[in-house]
Structures are given as C-alpha cells and as structure tokens.
Amino acid sequence: MITLIWCQDKHFGIGRDNTIPWKLTEANQHFYNTTKNQTVVMGYNTFQELGDKLTDHNVVVLSKKHFEELQNNTNIKVFNSIEKLLQHHFNRDLYVIGGKQIFHHFIELADRLIISVLPVDFKCNLRLKLGLDSFELMQEQQHSQFKVQYWHKKHPERLSFNVFLEDYNGTLPNLLELLIDKKFNLHQVDIAKITTQYLHLINTNLNKQAIEPITDYLVITSRIVEQKANNLLQINDIALDSDFLDNKLRDKLVAQLVEYKRYRESLDDFEKLRINRLAYFSKDNDFNRFIQTVDKSNTEPVKIEDELPNYVSVLKLHHAMNKLMQRWRAQFLANKNISIQELSIEQVQAEILATIKQFGYHSVSLKRVLLKVNHHISLMYFITAFVALLVLINNQIIDIEQTSFDDELYICLLDSSRIEQLQETPEAMVERAVKQRQEAQELARQVAREKAIANAQKREAYLKAKYGKDYLTREQFLKLSPEERAAHVAKMKQLKLVKNDNGRDN
C-alpha cells in the first residue's frame, strides 16, 4: 500500500523557503507515530530537512540529480526512478512524505492519503493542490492544534452504473443477469431512461479518473438499444414469423450478454496481471551504460556486452521486427481464438535455416523468410522467431545486415558447411534430444555406480583396519561352509563386544 502523508495550513501551504514553518509538537508526534518503523519515501530537499530526525525509519530518497552524491550513504537507499523504487519495494507499505514534486508523481499510485490540516495561515510560498476526485474522505479526527483527514481511493464498484426503471431499480450487471435468466422482459426495458441516466453519469465524471470503470457499460447498453431498434422496425413486417424472429433475436442478445459477462469476470485477473507486469525490469536500449574502463591507467573503454554484428543495434533490430509485425497485425487480430501452440526455439531455428537454403541466395530478407514458412504464422511463432534469430546470431550461425534504419533486415549465412551440419528436421531434432536425455541418464547412473564402488572400497579399508586378519570380504564369506559361517559370525560378535568394552574403559 502506498500512503501519502503531509501537513498543510488553511491555504494548502506545505513549506516556506524549503523549510517547515511550523513547530507543533502534537503534529510532529502524530507524524512520527504514524510512520515509525515504516519505509518513508522523500525527495532530496525533504531529506536535507528531515533526514537526521528519522532514526526509526527506513529512509528512501528519490532523486536523479543527487543520485551519485547519496549513493555512498549506507543509512539510506537511493533510487533515480519510480519504477526501480517500486520494483525493489514490491508488495511493501510505503509512506511518501514529500516534497511537492514527489507527491505529484505518486498521487495516481496512492491508495491512501493522510492529511494534517492546520487552521491558520503560515504565509507559505510552497503550496500543494492535488486532485482528490479519485479519493473519498473516510474519517476525520480533531486534535487540539489540527485535524487529520484520512482519504481512501474509491473502489471501482462504488462507481457502478445504477439504472432506475418502473419495474427495476439496481445496477446494470444485475439487469444483465435478469435478461440472461429470462426473468425480465426485454420489451420492459426503457432505453430512453437508461441512455439519459448513462449520459448523466458520464457528464458527471467526465474530468475524473473514475470514468474508466464505467466505460465498459457502453457496450452492453448499445447492444440493448440495437435489439430494441430491431424489434420496433420489424413490428409491421407481417411476412415474417414474429414469434420465431423475436426468439431468434432474443437468443442472439442473450449470447452477447453471456459473452459480456465473461469479459467482466475476467477483468480483475487481467488487472492483477497488469500490476504484476509493472514490477518487471526492462533493459535500456542504450549500450553506453555498459561501457566501463578496466582501470584508471587504461583509458580505452571496454564494453561489458558487445553490440550485434555489422553495427546493427538492438533498437534497429527491434524496429525492423516491429515493421514486419505491423504487416501481419491485421492477420493476428482477425483470429479471435486464443490457441496454445507448442513451439521450440530449436524448431524455429531449423525452419529459418531451411528456408534460407531454399532460396539459394547468400542473403535473404527476413520478410521473405517468414512468408516462406509452410504453416500459418501466429503471434507466438513471430515472437519465437525473434528469439531464435538472437540465438542464431549469438551462436555465430547467421549474420544480419541493414543499410538504413527503415530498410529491410537481411540474413546472411556465416558458414554454409556448418549450416549443412546443423540442418535438421523437427523429427531428427526430437530424436537427438531424446538421445541426449538418455545419455545424460546413463551418465548419472554411471556416476552413481562409481560412487557406490568408491564407498564400498572405503568401507572395506576401514573394516580391514579395524578387524585385521579376521575380516573377510563378501566373496570370501560366501565361499565358507555353513558351519564356518556360523563360527565366523560368532567370532566377529565377540570382537565387537571386546572393542566396545575397551572403548568404554578408555
């Protein structure tokens, strides 16, 4: 949970000349008790003002300009971007305490606001005015010197679309349930009233963040309007069987309502996926950040990670692949079914190499390669092909060329004899993988056998040292007669008892 906490005077003032103008013990104690032992996030100026007083807090400073300056401070954590800060403190409570720019950056991410309001004017030249339309006041506590307001972010369900008809008062999703279960007649739905109420709801929340949760009601409302319009236009068409037509149109509408309900139920899951995706870390396109020198005496820069060959940067490769993807975008979107396609990078590598070989050229455009693929190109195949290209480049099997930023991407074979050797069919590749797995299992069994033999040899050496000439190996013991075995066992038991007694005496 992200909480914004600050103190302001009656005119929204929060500071004067980068300092806090009031010295109120009660207000300071409230701030300390609320944030004690918590992670507090602040900017550089706020850290300079309050940093030495936050001894019982986990201090986090967000600053790009002073990032290098504060990095050596072991008592705090410093970040130069909100994304990195949130990634490092994922699923932790954060208290944002200032200053003004930090509040503006975090207001849309905040779940709660704690505002201490002073009843007087402190002549501040730094004021904080945030839009609180997406929050609602849950509680207000009055103290002797100030009052504290607790604001919580509005839940989307509280902004649901409520319709008021002659025979029904409630939310649109509940009306949807009644229509699906055929417990409410479509002819009783007053479209004019629903449309008027929906437009009023949109106009009321037009400039607020709250508009997002209710926009999806537009689809289902338009479906009901369409159904009602079709019924009205076909009343006088005596050539059609009205009962059959009504049932057919009603069934079509019910099917659409059921599909809409499924989308509504899946929104929460997609929202969780979206939030989880925000915590992922992505690598920058700029390779300059990976350049470093070995030591001070060596001024020549050394790259930790090499660029792609022929000066084709990752950005250019991404741009070229994105252009190809846009050409197939309409084809991808036309397919409404989400299917799971099992693909391996090795399989796609083999297909790419086989396609290049079919053209008989030294180099061929990636577009022609993908167009030559025998099966249907899906989005999953396209992404796998992108990864396969990177693997082939990394293994120095192919090279890529591009004359300009917007030009086609061309693939070149580096070693034709090596390509011939690596060229495999999917069946041969599966067979090779199975063979490799069997070899790995056999190797594991061989290692286990060798380990068992080594342990047996160690045990035999230990027993020989312990019992001397009286010790017999398993093979020697099996060659004895039953009488000799019984005598040997009795002798060994006696030796064990004697050795145990000697050990206790010592």
Curated annotation (Swiss-Prot):
Matches recorded under Gene3D superfamilies: 6.10.250.2410, Dihydrofolate Reductase, subunit A
BP-aspect Gene Ontology terms: cell division; chromosome segregation; tetrahydrofolate biosynthetic process
Locations listed in the record: Cytoplasm
Record region (ScpA): 167-506
Protein's name according to its UniProt entry: Segregation and condensation protein A
Family annotation (PROSITE patterns): DHFR_2 (PS51330)
Species the sequence originates in: Mycoplasma pneumoniae (strain ATCC 29342 / M129 / Subtype 1)
MF terms (GO), sorted A to Z: dihydrofolate reductase activity
Domain DHFR: 1-166
Protein family: Belongs to the ScpA family.
Alphabetical list of Pfam families matching this protein: DHFR_1, SMC_ScpA
Main location: cytoplasm
Function per UniProt: Participates in chromosomal partition during cell division. May act via the formation of a condensin-like complex containing Smc and ScpB that pull DNA away from mid-cell into both cell halves.
Quaternary structure and partners: Component of a cohesin-like complex composed of ScpA, ScpB and the Smc homodimer, in which ScpA and ScpB bind to the head domain of Smc. The presence of the three proteins is required for the association of the complex with DNA.
